[in-house]
Design a protein with these regions (language model features):
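A short beta-loop-alpha structural element at the N-terminal edge
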Residues: 15-33
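Conserved GNAT-fold acetyl-CoA-binding loop/helix
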Residues: 36-58
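Conserved beta-strand in the GNAT
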Residues: 70, 76-85, 95, 100
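A conserved beta-turn-beta hairpin within the catalytic core of GNAT-like acetyltransferases
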Residues: 86-96, 106, 152-154
Length: 169
């Protein structure tokens, strides 16, 4: 059963209504379009295609530990947020994997509303910790800092690139 949370983020004179819903597989194409438009722009400048975004989103959504929310204003998709629940020794944590708001709708409170809705849903199921990986910078790291997230003193992100040699066929 889909849960909806109605929100009022615009001025009363705008006559716009918003709602936050659980993400649904039937909307993957719509989510992918938003994902590509946001993450292929500043500050990320990624190179997503609709196809690769759809694969990523659908793969994530099909896991049993997935939890995600979508924000609509006047039936137009404005933002999505999702992660995976993980059991740790001290409770359930969530790895917040993706979070984006339509570029033209950023800095209007939509992201904060979406994050609060996810936090509310996580609280209901006993999630005790949220962690994420993001790019350095005020638009990314700064956004989370302003909402109570802190850099971990005892964790580090490490990567290893090009460890698998690919052969041409």
């Amino acid at each position: 059963m889909e849960k909806e949370a109605f929100i009022d983020l615009y001025d009363k004179d705008s006559n716009k209504t918003g709602k936050i819903t659980d993400m649904e597989l039937s909307h993957v194409a719509e989510y992918a379009e938003l994902f590509v438009s946001v993450f292929n722009a500043e500050p990320w400048n990624d190179s997503w295609t609709i196809e690769t975004a759809q694969i990523r989103i659908e793969n994530m959504m099909r896991t049993p530990t997935f939890i995600g929310k979508a924000l609509y204003v006047d039936n137009a998709l404005i933002g999505i947020i999702w992660g995976q629940k993980e059991q740790y020794y001290n409770g359930i944590h969530i790895h917040l994997q993706e979070f984006c708001v339509k570029t033209s709708e950023q800095n209007k409170g939509f992201g904060s509303a979406l994050l609060k809705a996810l936090e509310g849903a996580l609280s209901e199921i006993g999630v005790s910790n949220i962690y994420l990986i993001t790019s350095k910078g005020d638009k990314t790291e700064g956004y989370y800092s302003k909402r109570g997230f802190v850099s971990s003193d005892n964790m580090v992100l490490m990567t290893k690139h090009s460890f698998c040699k690919r052969t041409e066929k």
